Every structure is written in C-alpha cells, then in structure tokens.
Amino acid sequence: MAENSVFVGNKPVMNYVLAVLTQFNSGATEVSIKARGRAISRAVDVAEIVRKRFLPDVDVKDIKISTEQIDSEQGTANVSAIEIILAKK
C-alpha cells in the first residue's frame, strides 16, 4: 500500500490530484492520500476533486484520523493527521 500513497503538503491542489490520477491510471485499485496539520483541508480537497470531477467510479473506502506527537525545541506538539483511502468501485 505504501507505493500507492500521496503525501499532501504545500504545493497546489492540482499537483496532488494529478498524482492520484497517475496512480489509478497505472493500475492501482486503491490510493491513500495522507496529510498532517494545515494540509488536511488540502487533502480533503484532493479527494473530492478526484471523485467529483475526474473519476466518478472512485469511492472513499476509509478515512483514518490520528494525532502525532512532534518533538521540537519548545517541547512536544500534537499534530493532527488524516489518511483518506480511495478505491475503485
């Protein structure tokens, strides 16, 4: 499953949409979209754009949310994370 993952960051949304479409077009039946922190809303946008505009035969199979502890100089910070799994019908 790791090879079919798209990690969402600060790039424009369409870059990640293209990455997901490329995964599906290369034969993947499931693609995982992962994001942390502020990129979570961008990951949701990616999943919705793929489903509504490009691949109507793709559904959300699972959504996992979690909290990760990040150690920094100021101590530990909690960062939210999401994983959206898209699968072909």
Swiss-Prot record:
Q: Gene3D superfamilies under this entry?
A: Alba-like domain
Q: Which GO terms describe its biological process?
A: chromosome condensation
User: Has UniProt tagged this entry with the keyword Zinc?
Assistant: no
Give start-end of the signal peptide: none
Where's it mainly located?
cytoplasm
Q: Which HAMAP family match?
A: AlbA (MF_01122)
What name does UniProt use for this protein? DNA/RNA-binding protein Alba 1
Task: State the organism named in the record.
Answer: Archaeoglobus fulgidus (strain ATCC 49558 / DSM 4304 / JCM 9628 / NBRC 100126 / VC-16)
